[in-house]
Regions:
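A short beta-loop-alpha structural element at the N-terminal edge
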Residues: 26-39
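Active-site rim helix/loop that mediates acceptor-substrate recognition in acyltransferases
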Residues: 40, 47-92
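Conserved GNAT-family N-acetyltransferase fold
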Residues: 74, 84-86, 101, 106, ...
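A conserved beta-turn-beta hairpin within the catalytic core of GNAT-like acetyltransferases
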Residues: 91-103, 113
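Conserved acetyl-CoA-binding loop-helix of GNAT-fold acetyltransferases
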Residues: 103, 108, 114-127, 139
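Conserved active-site alpha-helix within GNAT-family acetyltransferase domains
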Residues: 131-135, 140-164
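C-terminal "cap" of GNAT-fold acetyltransferases
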Residues: 138, 159-191
Length: 191
């Protein structure tokens, strides 16, 4: 099920670290079929020069969509152009906990990075999960960045093969799940 943004953020959300150009309007909304090619292209561009990337993130989003596993898929649109995207999909946890999701990939076109668009997408995705009564969310990413959204490494939640400090969780409804987390097979997509 997709989350539909009920309002435009104009000119920028209050949590944006840098103001957007005053003549621009940022709009967050659920993806539509017409957005698929733009999401693929912007995801590829966003991760093209990232040293930490497998450079398959665009294929992961495509595979999640093909499997019907995009629980939340939001785009950031500026003056009619899709410039950002966030994907959220279900994860499984070895303790049997339900209602947990993985956030990512999250992408912003390089020319628009550092202007609060990623933060706006993060807040909107987490709000969509709250509206779905999700129990929690996990992600793989930079602790210094994602910590400001409430994410932190939890010793009881493990993603095999990943340094513990980069695998982070946000519990939305206690209790916190415990165990090994498994993402969708879509995360193995390479084309």
């Amino acid at each position: 099920m997709f989350f539909e943004a009920r309002r435009s953020l104009h000119p920028a959300p209050p949590w944006a670290p840098l103001p957007l150009k005053s003549s621009m309007t940022l709009r967050l909304r659920a993806e539509s079929p017409a957005d698929h090619a733009a999401i693929h292209a912007l995801t590829e561009a966003a991760f093209r020069d990232a040293a930490h990337s497998s450079h398959t993130e665009q294929f992961i989003v495509d595979a999640l969509r093909a499997r019907g596993e995009l629980s939340v898929s939001l785009v950031a649109e500026m003056d009619g152009k899709v410039i950002g995207h966030v994907a959220v999909s279900p994860v499984t946890i070895s303790d049997g906990s339900t209602g947990w999701f993985g956030l990512g990939p999250i992408s912003v076109l390089p020319a628009w990075q550092g202007q609060g668009i990623g933060a706006a997408l993060m807040h909107a995705a987490l709000e969509a999960l709250r509206q779905q009564a999700a129990h929690g969310c996990v992600l793989l990413g930079e602790p210094a960045y994602y910590g400001r959204f409430g994410f932190r490494a939890e010793p009881g939640l493990v993603l095999r093969g990943v340094p513990a400090e980069y695998f982070q969780a946000l519990c939305l409804q206690p209790p916190l799940a415990q165990g090994e987390v498994q993402y969708s097979p879509a995360f193995e997509a390479t084309a």
